[in-house]
Amino acid sequence: MPSEVLTSYYDYPTHDQEAWWRDTGPLFGRFLKGAGYDVHTQYQYLVFFIKNILPSLGPYPARWRSTITPTGLPIEYSLNFQLNSRPLLRIGFEPLSRFSGTPQDPYNKIAAADLLNQLSKLQLHEFDTQLFNHFTNEFELSKSESESLQKQGGINGKSTVRSQTAFGFDLKGGRVAVKGYAFAGLKNRATGTPVGQLISNSIRNLEPQMHCWDSFSILNSYMEESDGWNEYSFVSWDCVDIERSRLKLYGVHNAVTWDKVKEMWTLGGRIENNATIKTGLELLQHMWSLLQINEGDRDYKGGFAADNGGKTLPIIWNYELNKGSPHPAPKFYFPVHGENDLQVSKSISEFFTHLGWQDHARQYPHLLRQIYPNQNISQTERLQAWISFAYNERTGPYLSVYYYSAERPPWGSDQVK
């Protein structure tokens, strides 16, 4: 495998980079191979990983617990599945440095700025930093706000959102498409400005170029009515020309029940008569029934699944805003971290069969074993963390699986289970 070749011959500049590579690099290589990337493209993306992601993982093991994964790891691999195409590999990533969480950089701003600067030098296809700069200006703490938050006690243990920004990388066609993420929680704590107001202000300022305010207003009306905004809400965008980018709003909800999912999918009934929304809801309900998720109110308070077994993870919601679209497009992330991995893989395979995706249905359980050859998936419960689903009229169903993304168990545990 290409990752094995690089492990043997690459001279890593620091011990931390070598340790992170051994923990995340071969696994990344197995994801590339399992998803069907050719050998040339595997090398291409592995080199991108080594040159750009590895130096931004910071000290090993990580001292900063990232908000982007259930275990606090700063990196997450995911696979997207659609009709008549091989899986698409993505990387979610919060850059870290030796200063992250220290008095020099208590809220981890330095590493993100350094990585953005590095990406700007790579001449990535259609890469644009306008929206990244916009949202970091809107949500990142100023010096005075950081000092104010420190006086309030800073980040309170493990129970509060710690991250301010993150990146996503879609690996398709030999290219790297970059996404940005900005979290509103710390700004809310430092300033007292409600999260919904912070997000509304940031989007209103983009209206002359993005023309999505009407769609956002439908979403915001529902969020205000249902008290849906909270410290875990965040914004995402494509790092392309501002007039072509999508915006996505994310958040969590502890009511893991079908009634709440249906309510949120239809924005409290506001878009329930739309044919695409109806079709998507029917498919979503079928996936829900296959996964057999235990219904109830979760006690998620911002901790990490490595500490609580994963059974308290909430639902994640996501609404996409597109230029000229009359309403937001919903996506839901069902928590499966803490559920038996073999059973989850069988449920995913059954759902693929229901969709008529026979190749994906046949290959998925084998793919999971190929990615984690040293794990007995009939015994593990933490390899698959989330399953997301969306539906639109043009491309049909759209399903992604998010995975535990390191070779070693999280935070010094003796086993991944």
Curated annotation (Swiss-Prot):
Keywords annotated in UniProt: Prenyltransferase, Transferase
Pathway named in the protein's UniProt entry: Secondary metabolite biosynthesis; Alkaloid biosynthesis
Catalytic activity: cyclo(L-tryptophyl-L-alanyl) + dimethylallyl diphosphate = preechinulin + diphosphate
Organism domain of life: Eukaryota
GO terms for MF: prenyltransferase activity
EC number, UniProt record: 2.5.1.-
GO biological process: alkaloid metabolic process
Site (Required for regioselectivity): G92
UniProt binding sites for dimethylallyl diphosphate: R90, K179, Y181, K248, Y250, Y333, Y398, Y402
One Pfam family cited in the UniProt record for this chain: Trp_DMAT
InterPro entries xrefs: Aro_prenylTrfase, Aro_prenylTrfase_DMATS, DMATS-type_fun
Family membership: Belongs to the tryptophan dimethylallyltransferase family.
Described purpose of this protein according to its UniProt entry: Prenyltransferase; part of the gene cluster that mediates the biosynthesis of echinulin family alkaloid. The pathway begins with the biosynthesis of the cyclic dipeptide cyclo-L-Trp-L-Ala (cyclo-TA) by the NRPS echPS via condensation of L-alanine and L-tryptophan. The prenyltransferase echPT1 then catalyzes the first prenylation step, a reverse prenylation reaction at C2, to yield preechinulin. Preechinulin is the substrate of the cytochrome P450 monooxygenase echP450 that catalyzes the formation of the double bond between C10 and C11 to produce neoechulin A.
UniProt name for this protein: Echinulin prenyltransferase 1
Lineage of origin: Eukaryota, Fungi, Dikarya, Ascomycota, Pezizomycotina
